[in-house]
Amino acid sequence: MNGKKIRGGLAPGSLLVMLVFGIWFGGLSSDVCAAPFDYAMYQQFLDRYVVAGKYIEGIKLNVVDYDAIHKDQEKRHSLYGNILQQLAVFDPDMLQNREEEIAFWINTYNVGAIKMIIDHYSVDSIRSRKINWLRNPWGIKILTIGNNAYSLGQIEHEILIAKYKDPLIHFAIVCASLSCPDLSPQAYEGSQLKEQLQRQARQFLQNTKKGLRIRKEDGVVFFSQIFRFDKESFPNGATDAILLIAPFVDDKEDREFLMHPAQYTIKYLDYNWDLNTLSSVQ
């Protein structure tokens, strides 16, 4: 808190009430909240705006209703606006353990990617020149967290990858595109993080249009380009991802084939940067 004197001799309980209402309704934009992060609003947001199991350009994915978010943000105390305010006053140092920290920063990255789209609406891709002329939005300071501004690149590379070094994180961060992993309809939480990340990995890798495609008949395995993009986690590309991927391949023959890279050629699936928007559902 900023230590300013409260006029009128308010009872101690009144300060707590003011803090709660400030967090939820935008009254303490310059102060940092010293409390565990509550994902209730974010879960409501996901329930309202994320639709699972749709198809765009032949790719199955979870889509986002950006049209509705953009329209609703103009309402007073919209879910979207309240979430941004909640992040702005939250101090990440209050998170209690590694799992809570990872869950928080994954959720925050995904909110930031959505905000990138809404801030420049309407666009057909996060790499639209309307966002950045060089088609590189990752350096834009897009979110305020605890009174500090962050870019998507900072959250992904300087925090999630550099600090936690868990490659399963790649299956949870969503860059608002068709070929990226699906936006989970459930908020990530520290107490469930391991199971949530494993579920995300399995779902992504079972999607042959964007995750993994094994063709034993002609000796080719197609990997997602996320294993080529991130040189920090996968310096040798897909070759470095094989041991990570194998446990999530349910078919025994496919899994055994994957584990012997000398018998196949590594190729990469096309990466579709089109927006994962409900308005494009076929």
Tell where the protein language model's regions lie, with residue ranges.
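Sec/Tat signal peptide C-region and signal peptidase I cleavage site
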Residues: L28-A34
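Bacterial N-terminal signal peptides
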Residues: G13-G27
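Interaction/scaffold regions that mediate signaling and macromolecular assembly across diverse proteins
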Residues: A35-L95, E100-F104, A113-Q282
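N-terminal secretory signal peptides that target proteins for export/translocation
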Residues: M1-G9
